[in-house]
């Protein structure tokens, strides 16, 4: 089954770094996406805030460059996580992260 998502946007919540009891580092943040997409011949505003989690040592170095306001592209897979309040939320598990050059 295919499960791939590529999403670019702006980091809108400060990254939270944790290490699991088994020693695996995790970095969590929220990515806000805004764009104009074409659907059925019409332009529409597309907007979402997607929680992102980066797990493992491979991508942790780049997470130290990520702050609120960073523009990035994330590629990975999506999965549901159940919150402490019992509600489920969709989360993007990052496998590749690329900083978008602001051109400044």
Curated annotation (Swiss-Prot):
GO terms for biological process: DNA replication, synthesis of primer. Keywords: DNA replication, DNA-binding, Primosome. Belongs to the PriB family. The keyword DNA-binding applies. It comes from Citrobacter koseri (strain ATCC BAA-895 / CDC 4225-83 / SGSC4696). This is Replication restart protein PriB. Pfam families: SSB_1. HAMAP family: PriB. The gene is priB. Residues 1-101 form the SSB domain. InterPro entries: NA-bd_OB-fold, Primosome_PriB/ssb, Prisomal_replication_PriB.
């Amino acid at each position: 089954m295919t499960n791939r998502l590529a999403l670019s946007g702006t980091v809108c919540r400060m990254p939270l770094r944790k290490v699991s009891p088994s020693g695996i580092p995790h970095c969590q943040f929220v990515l806000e996406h805004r764009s104009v997409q074409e659907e059925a011949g019409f332009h529409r505003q597309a907007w979402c805030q997607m929680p992102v989690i980066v797990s493992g040592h491979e991508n942790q170095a780049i997470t130290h460059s990520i702050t609120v306001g960073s523009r990035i592209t994330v590629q990975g897979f999506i999965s549901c996580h159940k919150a402490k309040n019992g509600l489920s939320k969709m989360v993007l598990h990052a496998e590749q992260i690329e900083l978008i050059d602001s051109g400044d």
